[in-house]
Regions:
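Conserved SGNH/GDSL esterase-like catalytic core that processes O-acyl groups on lipids
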Residues: 14, 20-147
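Active-site segments of SGNH/GDSL-like serine hydrolases
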Residues: 127-136, 153-188, 211
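Catalytic His-Asp segment of secreted/periplasmic serine-dependent ester chemistry enzymes
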Residues: 172-271
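Pro/Thr/Ser/Gly-rich low-complexity, intrinsically disordered linker/stalk tracts
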Residues: 251-294, 327, 342-387, 424, ...
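Hydrophobic core positions of the immunoglobulin-like beta-sandwich fold
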Residues: 289, 320-323, 417-420, 465, ...
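Solvent-exposed loop/turn segments flanking beta-strands in beta-repeat/beta-sandwich domains
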Residues: 290-304, 382-401, 479-500, 536
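Short beta-strand segments within Ig-like beta-sandwich modules, predominantly Fibronectin type-III
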Residues: 310-317, 407-413, 501-503, 513-521
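Beta-strand-rich modules
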Residues: 322-343, 419-441, 527-550
Length: 584
């Protein structure tokens, strides 16, 4: 078809959406399925927009050091829009696949850029699929998201007053831990949108609702239409296109009948990755393999040689760097391509390598102090030998009181730093690693902090000891709001002190569970291997916030009566401490 003739005479359509509409490399996409429907219905359309492809996969790269905190903010990664489609899409579609959809896009972002795109591409009709990211990422609630969609319509009209809109509601996602709010917010938003859309139309610029949600087989425990609980698989692509086609037929008189979903949905090709290799590298062991076209990443399993159990991880590119290894450790690994939660290729053969890392150990003498909005930390450089010069240190912190929190790491130079912008009252776990030209070394933990509570907490109270077996004792005490953690101390009858450690670092502290900020929480620690018996020792508890420590609690001993529990209780033969919370 002659492009100039097509541009002049065709009905111009722009898809405005997020990753659901953008698609990933190897997808057919619902945009292709509705293009096929237009072709079958004899509707001559020209898809317009700034992009033409899907989202291309991540490129493999070695481990990158964390961004330096005193530099300009790390720029966002460039938008990837050059990914290919399924190998069997019609060549004519590849010349007519333009769109304005991008992974991660929110309605509150799209409303600020839509006028420019409409002015540039002059669509006659916008197929709008947005809003999930606003709710799913807690950017805004249902009312605010609805307002963003109305602003999008208004600003698009400012560039083309006669623009038509087919506006989709949002799908239910499969259930997520700690996100009971999401299906509730989804229903509220969809109800608001359905009631509002009729009032958004004008005589020359109609707006019609697309019932994406009710046509999409996803939500709760059902994921028939989605490969990951949200994004469409081959069936889901047909279902979304069908939902839009219903609206185009009924409200815009485009086409004669809605798209019919075929009985046989084409399978996604997913061969086993080829050429897996594992080699020793300065940072540990590097595993690579040939990329699989259309894979949504890879499942990788690894284990130390002669062990039977695999550890699993998911990677987005065809490379994985096994870090934090000791010299001489042999690692085995295997890989399979992933097409989502249920579609997997067969595993590769097992590859192996022996580590000879050249990285530096973690810094020493780390000292932390809570501040009103974060924490301050100081340290000393690690002792040699190690390869190369120290380039920077990585400071990692994790908010244990925020559901869904992720580990954040920033780069620093020197021997001290202050991290700000954290949530007062929340507990943060902290660790550091050293970066040289060889890469990042094995991290070590510093003392955790409760932000905004910098003074040393009071001594723990209500400390009690109870024999569990002849060699194991259970300690309980009242949890403290200002404590980030606790030291457990014991002394023998001669008064010789001993600190019990959970972590193999300078931190002697038992890391407490979430929820212990409540002053009414009771802490519990089980201490095994108190030889020759638990009655030969006295026990005390010390609270801390960073390196600010309380006084020791009173010393306690278990009652002298013999325990009823059997002496062969299943406790590890190490100085580990097991903490639990009893509420009430």
């Amino acid at each position: 078809m002659n492009r100039s003739v097509k541009e002049k005479d065709a009905f111009r359509v722009m898809v405005v959406g997020d990753s659901i509409s953008h698609g990933r490399e190897g997808d057919w996409t619902w945009r292709y399925r509705i293009w096929q429907w237009f072709e079958q219905e004899g509707v001559w359309v020209d898809f317009v927009g700034p992009y033409a492809g899907t989202s291309s996969p991540d490129k493999p790269h070695p481990p990158r050091p964390p961004w330096l905190i005193d530099e300009s903010p790390e720029p966002p990664p460039p938008l990837r829009t050059d990914g290919g489609y399924a190998k069997d899409v019609a060549p004519r579609f590849l010349a007519n696949s333009n769109h304005f959809a991008a992974g991660g896009r929110q309605a509150c972002q799209a409303k600020d850029v839509i006028a420019e795109q409409v002015a540039s591409h002059q669509p006659d009709l916008c197929l709008v699929q947005l809003g999930f990211n606003d709710l799913g990422w807690r950017v805004s609630g249902p009312v605010e998201t609805l307002a963003s969609m109305k602003h999008l319509v208004d600003r698009a009209r400012s560039a083309k007053p006669d623009l038509k809109f087919a506006m989709a509601d949002i799908p239910y996602r499969t259930d997520l831990p700690d996100r009971e709010d999401l299906p509730v917010s989804t229903k509220i938003y969809n109800d608001l949108l359905a009631r509002s859309v009729p009032y958004w139309s004008t005589a020359e610029s109609p707006v019609a609702l697309v019932r994406f949600c009710e046509n999409y087989s996803c939500g709760g425990s059902n994921s028939d239409a989605a490969y990951d609980g949200l994004h469409p698989n081959a069936l889901g692509e047909y279902q979304i296109a069908r939902a839009f086609s219903h609206t185009l037929v009924s409200d815009f008189k485009l086409g004669r009948s809605a798209l019919a979903i075929p009985d046989r949905i084409p399978p996604r090709p997913l061969p086993t990755p080829a050429s897996i290799r594992a080699v020793s590298a300065p940072s540990g062991i590097t595993i690579t393999w040939d990329a699989v076209y259309g894979a949504f990443g890879y499942d990788l399993q690894h284990r130390f040689a002669r062990e039977s159990d695999w550890e699993s991880t998911h990677v987005d590119s065809n490379r994985y760097d096994q870090r934090w290894l000791q010299k001489g450790q042999a690692v085995e690994c295997r890989v399979r391509a992933s097409g989502g939660d249920t579609l997997k290729s067969p595993w590769t053969k097992v590859a192996s390598a022996v580590a000879d890392p050249q990285t530096a150990p973690a810094p020493t003498n780390m000292v932390t102090r809570a501040t009103p909005t974060g924490f301050a930390i100081s340290w000393e450089p690690p002792p040699p030998p190690y390869a190369g010069e120290i380039d920077r240190y990585g400071i990692a912190h994790f908010d244990s009181d925020q559901p869904g929190a992720v580990l954040c790491t920033v780069g620093v130079r020197g021997q001290s730093a202050e991290i700000t912008g954290l949530t007062p009252g929340h507990r943060y776990y902290i660790a550091m690693e050293t970066w040289t030209t060889a890469g990042g070394g094995i991290p070590a933990a510093a003392r955790a902090v409760v932000v905004g509570r910098g003074t040393p907490p009071a001594a723990p109270t209500s400390v009690r000891a109870q024999a569990v077996t002849r060699l194991a004792v259970e300690l309980t005490w009242a949890g403290m709001p200002a404590a980030a953690g606790y030291d457990i101390w014991v002394r023998d009858r001669r008064g010789v002190l001993r600190s019990l450690a959970l972590c193999p670092s300078r931190e002697r502290v038992v890391r407490v569970s979430d929820g212990s900020l409540s002053g009414g929480s009771m802490m519990k620690a089980v201490i095994p291997n108190m030889r020759p018996s638990v009655w030969e020792w006295e026990y005390a508890v010390e609270a801390y916030n960073g390196d600010n420590q309380s006084k020791l609690s009173e010393w306690v001993t278990p009652p002298p009566e013999a325990p009823e529990s059997p002496e062969d209780m299943s406790l590890a033969d190490t100085d580990s401490i097991h903490i639990a919370l009893n509420h009430g």
